[in-house]
Amino acid sequence: MKTIIALSYIFCLVLGQDFPGNDNSTATLCLGHHAVPNGTLVKTITNDQIEVTNATELVQSSSTGKICNNPHRILDGIDCTLIDALLGDPHCDGFQNETWDLFVERSKAFSNCYPYDVPDYASLRSLVASSGTLEFISEGFTWTGVTQNGGSNACKRGPDSGFFSRLNWLYKSGSTYPVLNVTMPNNDNFDKLYIWGVHHPSTDQEQTSLYVQASGRVTVSTKRSQQTIIPNIGSRPWVRGLSSRISIYWTIVKPGDILVINSNGNLIAPRGYFKMRTGKSSIMRSDAPIGTCISECITPNGSIPNDKPFQNVNKITYGACPKYVKQNTLKLATGMRNVPEKQTRGLFGAIAGFIENGWEGMIDGWYGFRHQNSEGTGQAADLKSTQAAIDQINGKLNRVIEKTNEKFHQIEKEFSEVEGRIQDLEKYVEDTKIDLWSYNAELLVALENQHTIDLTDSEMNKLFEKTRRQLRENAEDMGNGCFKIYHKCDNACIGSIRNGTYDHDVYRDEALNNRFQIKGVELKSGYKDWILWISFAISCFLLCVVLLGFIMWACQKGNIRCNICI
């Protein structure tokens, strides 16, 4: 019984132990940083996955689904290709003299006139698209001895046979087709684009019935170039009831140069010229609808915001667009390293500093203080260190965007079948560029993330060192981001430490005196729980021993009888 009384006395002493923060003559001050229950994983140079409190996605992975009509002027081709609009296909007459920043060709576009081919289709399409206009000026060509304005039932304009409005089909007059030799100087100060063609009859009979001569020839020259085309007579696959074809060619006449056209048959003559302009207009194949909205960047999938530095929506873009990369996601850290707060801290609910874990619920700052003193507990943010970190992180996203946003458009690359090797080379170059940019993007983000985490850790350490220098020997570093203050420190005192007005000398004597009065052995908080549980276990064991001894004594005296049956 004496043993039990002694153990109970020890247990009470343990419970009455003077723990840090419970003594009115001391206080505990901890420094910590913001934490969230579920952070975001980012990549750094040294770590493939590190959790931070906040991060911003840098890759735009979706479009609006529509092409915005502002600030770029969008011209919807509807059912016309750009070349059909250029030639003057009857169903494309509405595009005459139109202008655009971006011409949108649709998959449903079709030709509805005389069947033709353009040997250098991609180059002509690109040239006209970049000019951004179909402005056409008629000129007074003189074609003597031939019939003009030929037409075909395959190219009806209303109920009548027609032809391309920008071309003039010449054929024999009576039974003659004289040699034509026409010149047209360029006396203006801009480039002129002339579109002309050569007719390829399907039979020799068709050739002579239209042009008299068994074989025609067309030569178009300038001071810088010359093209001579001999018609290829022969049947071709039937298109819109015709097995003959027209080949479309084009010539650019510079200022001061002269256009010379010579032919003895098969000439599809120009009616004038297109005024060429230099600019950044372009063309794009897309079936996305055109909507009333604002977006600087357009892809075939639709417009996309350009508030992110990277995108993986489409390689083809127009406008000021994010750089295309292969990655679906790249996250830029805009917060500090995240260490979620431990939910339980032993029997006494002790507070802990940044070395052990972060603090959840700090909504007014990234860094702050928690304290325990005679007036209770409290928490406050340190706005100065928070602002110092935010100021350095702010603008990081904008700087990355400035480094990566393209101020030009990436157009479609088209090549004819005979340029297959060039197309393969172009594809290889483009794929290599994308690989390099994807690698550079990942490296850039990893470097920025490393800098952000190091920066926020540095600000935490600066705040801790600033507090240490204020307290000096008036407090002891507890090794977990906390200080044990050896003098009475009420809320006003704690506030002076936070705002940097703490006077070390005022509390020096009291702190030194309290240090010497501390008990010889101060149990660390980690061992208190162990001692309590061990004391409790020993007490229970001794109680069981006493109870068992009492039962055996009672049985021996006959007060209790125990029968064991087998």
Swiss-Prot record:
Disulfide bonds join 30-482, 68-293, 80-92, 113-155, 297-321, 489-493. One of its GO terms (molecular function) is host cell surface receptor binding. Residues 1-16 form the signal peptide. The keyword Disulfide bond applies. Glycans are attached at residues 24, 38, 54, 97, 181, 301, 499. One of its GO terms (biological process) is fusion of virus membrane with host endosome membrane. Residues 552-566 are cytoplasmic. A lipid is attached at residues 555, 562, 565 (S-palmitoyl cysteine). It is a single-pass type I membrane protein. Major glycoprotein, comprises over 80% of the envelope proteins present in virus particle. Homotrimer of disulfide-linked HA1-HA2. This is Hemagglutinin. It comes from Influenza A virus (strain A/Udorn/307/1972 H3N2). The gene is HA.
